[in-house]
Amino acid sequence: MATKKEDVKFEDNLAELENIVRKLESGDVALEDAIAEFQKGMKISETLKKTLNEAEETLVKIVGKNDQESDFSPEQKDY
């Protein structure tokens, strides 16, 4: 099992975030628990966003190294 936040896989974080969203959407969560879950979800969301941004930068570098044309650019962000 992962011991550090950095060791947790993207897919595991995404699944955890989906579970939090389902729990909050159910409405069966006490207010204090809902706030805690929301805060946890926001932290996971930031981690996922950072991971995606790093992956995007890596792909841009790889494509750039291979001197291949691409319609993709780091400026074209749809989020």
From Swiss-Prot:
Task: Cite a single Pfam family from the UniProt record.
Answer: Exonuc_VII_S
Subcellular location(s): the record lists: Cytoplasm
Domain of life assignment: Bacteria
What Gene3D superfamilies does its record include? Exonuclease VII, small subunit (1.10.287.1040)
> Which enzyme class?
hydrolase
Name a single GO biological process: DNA catabolic process
Q: Which reaction does it catalyse?
A: Exonucleolytic cleavage in either 5'- to 3'- or 3'- to 5'-direction to yield nucleoside 5'-phosphates
Instruction: Please provide the record's keywords in A-Z order.
Output: Cytoplasm, Exonuclease, Hydrolase, Nuclease
- EC numbers listed for it are 3.1.11.6
Gene Ontology cellular-component terms listed:
cytosol; exodeoxyribonuclease VII complex
Q: Does the keyword Cytoplasm apply?
A: yes
Ion transport as a keyword?
no
MF terms (GO), sorted A to Z: exodeoxyribonuclease VII activity
Per UniProt, subunit arrangement is: Heterooligomer composed of large and small subunits.
NCBIfam families recorded: PRK00977.1-2, xseB
What does it do?
Answer: Bidirectionally degrades single-stranded DNA into large acid-insoluble oligonucleotides, which are then degraded further into small acid-soluble oligonucleotides.
Family (UniProt): Belongs to the XseB family.
Annotated protein name in UniProt: Exodeoxyribonuclease 7 small subunit
**Species annotation:** Lactococcus lactis subsp. lactis (strain IL1403)
